[in-house]
Amino acid sequence: ERISTGVMNELADRGYQVVIVLFGTDKTSAFPLNDKIKILLIGIPFENKYKLKAAFYLKKIINEIKPDYVINVAVPMMQVSFLAKCLGMKGKVVTWDHFTLFAGSQWGVFFRIFSAFVSHQTIVLTEQDRNSYPRLLRKKIRVIGNFVMDAKFKSNLMSKKVLSVGRLVHTKGFDILLDIWGDISKRHSDWILQIVGSGEEKENLRKKIEELHLEENVQMIPTVKNIEDYYIDASIYVSAARLEPWGLVLAEAKSFGLPIVCFDCPHGPKNIVRDGMDGNLIALNDCNEMKEKILLLMDDLELRRKYGEAARKDFECRFSKRAIFNKWTELLK
């Protein structure tokens, strides 16, 4: 929702007339919305038994406001917009998918392929995601990554802090990172690992910190609004994620000029981190290699600066608001 809201706000600022159509009866947004954006309610829950009725009302709303494009935020929305299209809804339908083709069940794969077939265009996050679709559909699929707000400041890379940000869930691999940090702290007891995030694995991770006697070397910080303060104060960014569909935090780290060490897990990191240029991509679960690359950056300020400068420049070229919205403008022209 944060990404979707950010895109809609920026499009409104750029002169596009943006109308958000919501299911249900609640107009509340978890994130601030541009005053230029209009919100309309279908007034029907997003449930299977109501989808045909919802499609009828969606067709009515869309044909009244006459947009050039109808953007489905996520593939499930396509089910209703497809029915609405069959009922006579006008406008080109674009489906914006934030997940990989094979995320979820076999039905999910079917719906994604069907969605790409019936949509005017489909937006995916990475080139890997695009290439996972059948070849005949790829010409209708565009790669537009999530944009990241430009950092006002960048780290001076002088602190003795390593940062990792994300939900405290199994796929993010914080348990692996703690094992790696247990070895690193024996050599660099003056460095601190900061883990910022909340989630179901919180207590398990706290127990692991105690078992590894890392209470003085690891700080666990709940999700915060001022996350930029932690990026600015760090010298290295690390991710031991087992799975990362895109990797918003990696792009954020680059915006602050942080060198990155992360596992080359499916599907996002290799699309963001350039191995040996602005960070290091480590073979999945090669904990020893990750430890060595982190230690190398700890011991070499000039290497941190080299990677950090390259990270910042690459962010501006590929992940900044300007770069991403050039692609949106091309799509919507």
Residue ranges and their predicted role:
Residues 1-6, 160-186, 193, 200-207, ...:
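A conserved mid-protein helix/loop that constitutes part of the nucleotide-sugar donor-binding site
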Residues 2-49:
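N-terminal strand-loop element at the rim of the active site
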Residues 72-79, 97:
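Short His-centered aromatic/hydrophobic patch
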Residues 118-152:
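Donor nucleotide-sugar binding/catalytic pocket of nucleotide-sugar-dependent glycosyltransferases
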Residues 223, 242:
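Aromatic "clamp/platform" in nucleotide-sugar-dependent glycosyltransferases that forms part
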Residues 259-263:
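Short hydrophobic beta-strand element within catalytic cores of glycosyltransferases
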Residues 274-276, 280-288, 295-302:
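Conserved acidic donor-binding segment of nucleotide-sugar-dependent glycosyltransferases
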Residues 289, 296, 303-318, 324-330:
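A short, well-ordered alpha-helix in the C-terminal region of glycosyltransferases
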